Each structure stands twice: as structure tokens, then as C-alpha cells.
């Protein structure tokens, strides 16, 4: 009888600790010390939320930097999500997979020697918000032409917004870069 009572007490204590106190403590720590990150790292422009620093978006206009291709086609449509059951993730296809090869060829829209790897392939999450500085610099002439500004101004903007990679190439956040472009005075 004593063993049963001890087992029930331990179960209740574990449920309270793991199911209530620990989540409450982590939520409080997140809200107090990491408020921006705990709430999605949302970016506001013109008094409205335009996206998250953590999730890439599908950019198609020539006047904006384009992010990495998405393995899940930036699946933010609830109908698609219900049908496909995927909201993020890589393709998990091998280098020899014909569908992957076709998708990469589709994303390579200009001379093959001029394409960075991140311009043609998706990230592991399928929603990476960053591109390499090299990729951004290769897009600079297109953006400069579309906005009727000098390529050097666009390149300066890229250099000003770049973030240092630890074990990776330097990179830029596409959404932040595009907002900076919109804020740029002609």
C-alpha cells in the first residue's frame, strides 16, 4: 500500500513540476529576458507587422532581394498546410534525385557560373530568412536597375547590413535588407 501511495505522489509531483512549473518558468524567463525572440522576432514597418526576422518570405519583384528557394514553397496557406501536412522542412532528396535537379534548374535563372549555392537550393528548414552576402551582391545590379540607383549604393547597403557567420559565410537578412531598400532616399 505504501508503494502505491508513493507512486501516486511521485506521479502528481512530476506532473506539477513538468506540466506546470517548468513551462511557467521557461515562459517567464523568455518573456522577461528574451521578449523579442519569445514573441517571434516580428519586424514592424510603417506601423504594421511585415514579417519575422526568423522566417523567410517569397519575394518576386525585381526591385527587391530574393531569398532562398523554399522546399515547401513558403507553405503559409492553411489549405495547403492541411492538404500537404508540411509547414517547414527540407526536401530530403538526394543530389541525384530528378525532381531536385529540375527544381534547382528552375531556380537558376541566369548564367550557371554566376549563381551562388544558396540562390539555387533550399535550406534545411525550407524557410531560411538569410542569403549570403555574395548572393546579395550578385542581385545588386538587378535591384539598382529596377530602382534607378547606382549599384554601389545597393552594395553599400548590403555591406552595412551584413552579419558575420561563425562557421559560415557572411549573410544578410532578406526582409531587413528589403525594408532598408524601401527606406533608402533616392
UniProtKB/Swiss-Prot annotation:
Protein name (database record): Potassium-transporting ATPase KdpC subunit
Subunit-level organization: The system is composed of three essential subunits: KdpA, KdpB and KdpC.
MF terms in GO: ATP binding; P-type potassium transmembrane transporter activity
Family of the protein in this entry: Belongs to the KdpC family.
Membrane-crossing segments per the record: 10-30
Subcellular location: Cell membrane
InterPro entries: KdpC
Domain of life (superkingdom): Bacteria
PANTHER family recorded: POTASSIUM-TRANSPORTING ATPASE C CHAIN, POTASSIUM-TRANSPORTING ATPASE KDPC SUBUNIT
Gene name of the record: kdpC
GO cellular component: plasma membrane
Keywords: ATP-binding, Cell membrane, Ion transport, Membrane, Nucleotide-binding, Potassium, Potassium transport, Transmembrane, Transmembrane helix, Transport
Native source organism of the sequence: Staphylococcus aureus (strain MRSA252)
Topology term for the membrane: Single-pass membrane protein
General function of this protein: Part of the high-affinity ATP-driven potassium transport (or Kdp) system, which catalyzes the hydrolysis of ATP coupled with the electrogenic transport of potassium into the cytoplasm. This subunit acts as a catalytic chaperone that increases the ATP-binding affinity of the ATP-hydrolyzing subunit KdpB by the formation of a transient KdpB/KdpC/ATP ternary complex.
Amino acid at each position: 500500500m505504501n508503494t502505491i501511495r508513493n507512486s501516486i505522489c511521485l506521479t502528481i509531483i512530476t506532473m506539477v513540476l513538468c506540466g506546470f512549473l517548468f513551462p511557467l518558468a521557461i515562459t517567464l524567463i523568455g518573456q522577461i529576458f528574451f521578449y523579442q525572440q519569445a514573441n517571434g522576432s516580428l519586424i514592424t514597418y510603417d506601423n504594421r507587422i511585415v514579417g519575422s526576422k526568423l522566417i523567410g518570405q517569397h519575394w518576386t519583384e525585381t526591385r527587391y532581394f530574393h531569398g532562398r528557394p523554399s522546399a515547401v514553397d513558403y507553405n503559409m496557406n492553411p489549405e495547403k498546410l492541411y492538404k500537404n501536412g508540411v509547414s517547414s522542412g527540407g526536401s530530403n532528396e538526394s543530389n541525384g534525385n530528378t525532381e531536385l535537379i529540375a527544381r534547382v534548374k528552375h531556380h537558376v535563372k541566369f548564367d550557371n557560373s554566376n549563381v551562388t549555392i544558396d540562390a539555387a537550393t533550399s535550406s534545411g528548414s525550407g524557410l531560411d530568412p538569410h542569403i549570403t552576402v555574395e548572393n546579395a551582391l550578385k542581385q545588386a545590379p538587378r535591384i539598382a536597375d529596377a530602382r534607378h540607383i547606382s549599384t554601389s549604393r545597393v552594395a553599400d547597403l548590403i555591406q552595412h547590413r551584413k552579419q558575420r557567420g561563425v562557421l559560415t559565410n557572411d549573410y544578410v537578412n532578406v526582409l531587413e535588407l528589403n525594408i532598408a531598400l524601401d527606406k533608402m532616399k533616392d
